[in-house]
Amino acid sequence: MTTITLPPPNARYQFSILPEIFKQGLPDTDADTFDYAKENFGLIPRAYPSDGTMEDVESKTPWQRFEHYVKTLNGNAEEGTEYKVLYLGRHGQGYHNVAESRYGTKLWDDYWARQEGDEHAHWADAHLTEIGEQQARDVNTFWRTALADAKVPAPETYYTSPFYRCLQTASLSFSSLDLPADRPFVPVVKELLRETNGVHTCDRRGASSIIRKDFPMYVLEKGLPETDVSWTPDRRETPVEHILREHVLLEQVFAEDEHEFISFTAHSGTIAAVLGAVGHRRFALPTGGVIPIVVKGEKLIR
């Protein structure tokens, strides 16, 4: 069990989850069997305090009423308080996931994760398998229906981990969608969204020049070095360190991004750390899984 006191002493923000919005946040929802695509993304059917201020509310979908609620919360929020909806997506199956299943987690952690690959595949900065590509296309299919029918708000900003499997997943998930003109798919590559750092070669970033070459429409955040200077072969980031790293990421997003609906394409460990940073219950995602959350950010006075 990871024990951590949040916010950390040097924090600029305190984060919390807006409860009773999504089924994934309820204690009796089983992450192993829950299918977000069959459950309206997990949105709990309910009335909102803002329903009375919405024109033609009876004709609106639950997601349209929820979107109005979020905008109302932000419109009435005290100075320094803001609400953001985060769509947290895990990459599709990568070659490293297949290798861990082949060898078992203990042998993977003890030996194979430190190697570049085996006779079956190369997994340093792992790419998606064919199954992983299809999982990402399944996310695209979900979004296509969700946008058109349920009226789920499209992300206004897209952030992705710099690892190749996430760059692929983001592209396959979003690039072919009929998105609103003011919400184009122009993802920003953020280093802080990387997987738990160190030791595992699958979690060592490839060259930034490869990202520019293979994903020319992606925007690399300022200062991303050509090579992965933070990865080390002999020390793995701890769960507490990872939660603190994602707390910094959230501080950046809340301080610098004015948008309310934001997509993160990342990793199992990273999403777990984001959930930990905002006080959400543990909710493990399968490869290709997505979970929405509403985060309340309160700026701290130091």
Where are these regions (language model features)?
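Active-site-proximal alpha-helix that buttresses catalytic centers in soluble enzyme cores
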Residues: T2-F185, V189, R212, P239-E246
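Histidine/lysine/aspartate-rich catalytic loop segments that bind and position anionic ligands
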Residues: V188-G198, R204-R235
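Regulatory modules of eukaryotic transcription factors, especially in plants
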Residues: T232-V240, I271
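C-terminal transmembrane module of eukaryotic multi-pass membrane proteins
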Residues: V253, D257-H267, A273-L275, R281
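A short, acidic, amphipathic alpha-helical segment used as a generic capping/interface helix at domain edges
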Residues: H242-E258
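Short, solvent-exposed loop/turn segments at secondary-structure junctions
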Residues: G92-Y95, F163-C166, L193-E195, V229, ...
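Short aromatic-enriched loop/helix-cap "lid" or pocket-rim segments at secondary-structure transitions
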Residues: N97-R102, V199-D203, A277
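Domain-level recognition of soluble alpha/beta enzyme cores
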Residues: G279-R302
